[in-house]
C-alpha cells in the first residue's frame, strides 16, 4: 500500500502554508516533470521528502506573505495565517485576505509567481582516519520485537502466532500511517525469514568444480 507519502506531504504543506489540507494537491512527478532522486527506500519518505516539502512550503509562504502584505499595506512580519486559507493582520483579524486572493493578486497585479523549492540532503559521512568509524545512516529505528511461534517437530513447519512490536517513533505526523508501516515492516520481516530464498540452499561453484 506504500508509505502514504501523498497524505503526509499534504499535511506538511498545508500546515506550513496555513491552508486546509483539502486545498493541497500532490502531483506525483516523474523525470519529465521533476528532478531525479534516489527514492524513499527503508521507510524514510517522511524524513527525506517531508523535510524537502517543508523547506519548499516555507519559501512559498514567505513569498505569499510578502504579496499579501503589499495588498494589505502592512509589513509581512505583521501577518499570520489561520489554517483555513486566510491571511490576517496580527491582532486585527478583520483586516484579511485569502490565500487564493493573494495568489491572484501576486500573479495578475504584482507580476510575480508564488512558488517554493526545497531539497533535503543528508551530509555524507567520512571515515574517521583515527578510529575508522563512520555514521552509516542518518537515523536509526529504536525498536524491539518479540515473535511467538510454533514449530512442527516432524515437518519443521513454522507458524507465527503473534508479533509484538514496540517502537520509539518520535513525533508521528500521521499515527495511522505509522501504524501501517510498523505492521507492514513486521510482516515483511516474517516474509524474509520464512518465505524468501535461503542462501543455504543456493549452490555456488567452488574450486572442486574446476
Would you name each region that the model predicts?
Residues 201-210:
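Single conserved hydrophobic/aromatic residue that forms the stacking wall/gate
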Residues 1-202:
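Cofactor-binding beta-sheet edge motifs in enzyme active sites
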Amino acid at each position: 500500500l506504500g508509505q502514504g507519502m501523498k497524505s503526509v506531504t499534504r499535511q506538511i504543506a498545508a500546515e506550513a502554508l496555513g491552508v486546509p489540507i483539502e486545498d493541497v494537491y500532490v502531483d506525483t512527478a516523474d523525470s519529465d516533470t521533476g528532478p531525479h532522486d534516489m527514492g524513499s527506500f527503508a521507510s524514510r519518505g517522511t524524513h527525506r521528502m517531508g523535510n524537502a516539502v517543508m523547506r519548499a512550503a516555507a519559501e512559498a509562504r514567505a513569498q505569499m506573505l510578502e504579496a499579501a502584505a503589499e495588498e494589505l499595506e502592512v509589513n509581512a512580519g505583521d501577518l499570520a495565517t489561520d489554517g483555513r486559507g486566510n491571511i490576517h493582520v496580527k491582532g486585527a483579524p478583520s483586516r484579511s485576505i485569502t490565500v487564493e486572493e493573494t495568489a491572484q493578486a501576486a500573479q495578475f497585479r504584482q507580476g510575480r509567481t508564488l512558488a517554493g523549492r526545497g531539497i533535503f540532503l543528508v551530509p555524507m559521512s567520512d571515515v574517521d582516519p583515527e578510529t575508522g568509524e563512520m555514521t552509516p545512516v542518518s537515523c536509526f529505528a529504536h525498536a524491539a520485537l518479540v515473535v511467538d511461534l510454533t514449530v512442527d517437530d516432524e515437518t519443521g513447519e513454522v507458524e507465527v502466532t503473534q508479533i509484538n512490536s514496540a517502537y520509539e517513533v518520535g513525533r508521528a505526523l500521521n499515527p495511522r500511517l505509522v501504524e501501517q508501516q510498523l505492521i507492514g515492516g513486521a510482516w515483511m520481516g516474517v516474509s524474509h525469514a520464512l518465505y524468501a530464498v535461503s542462501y543455504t540452499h543456493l549452490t555456488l561453484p567452488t574450486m572442486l568444480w574446476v
